Amino acid sequence: MKIIKPLIVFILFLCGCNTNSNKPEQNNNNSVITNNNAENLNSDENIIGSYVGIFGQNGNDNKITLLISRIDNNIIEGRTIVGGNDRPFNGTIVAEGDDFRVNAKEPGDDKYDGEFNFSINKFNTNELRGNWAPFKNTTSAKSYTLYKKKFAYDANVGIYPIASTRLLNTTDVENMVKSELSYMRNEIFARHGYCFKKKDMRNMFELLDWYVPNTVDIKNFLTEIEKKNISLIKRYEEYADEYGDDYGR
């Protein structure tokens, strides 16, 4: 009996060790699931933001900003700014393998509204690839590759940064021809991310790396310096219209 009792105690001790060794294994599995969920959530947060690029593959297509503003479970919301239009969209986002796949639709009350289908790789959330199809036959379908880029106002970019950084004098503009004056004035708007409705204005700025279409209304974003400079430039544009070739250099 003296031998048996210590033997029983030893066996019970071994069983207790084996039971304890199994518990951490279950806890580890649970923590992996939690970490995976957190990783997915972080990936969702990483894809929120603006993606910018050419909307189409024809060589003369407009630059687009696609803004993902909200993700709630599998619901996604945002808006696009392109060709002078600012349109909302909403839809679904699902994880498939290494990608987030999005199907989203614009409201449908504009003749150029349509449906987006695009994907973002979980390991490269700086790039978005997809296509868009119009609801009506008012325009052609588009394919696109967009890159994450945050809009930031910078008064110092462009050919005529002085129009945003200091008050202009008459000597700054009196010898400029109308095309130069027009460019100087519209460059102020471009710095604020204004999405031009006129095709010729879009062509001037959309190939510039610093230009990011961000809004169709910039009235509340212009600085006091810029407002005064715009008024001065407009006056000289009117002079150029009146005097034609005799005006400017």
Question: Each PLM stretch: what is its role?
Answer:
Residues 2-9:
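Sec-dependent signal peptide recognition
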Residues 14-16:
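C-terminal motif of bacterial Sec signal peptides marking the signal peptidase cleavage site
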Residues 32-124, 138-145:
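Central antiparallel beta-sheet cores of small beta-barrel/beta-sandwich binding domains
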Residues 131-138:
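Short, exposed beta-strand-loop hairpins at the edges of beta-sheets
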Residues 196, 203-249:
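Compact alpha-helical subdomains of small soluble proteins
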Residues 138-162, 167:
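Pro/Ala/Gly-rich low-complexity, hydrophilic intrinsically disordered segments
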Residues 18-20:
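Bacterial signal peptide processing site
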Residues 172-214:
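Amphipathic alpha-helical packing elements
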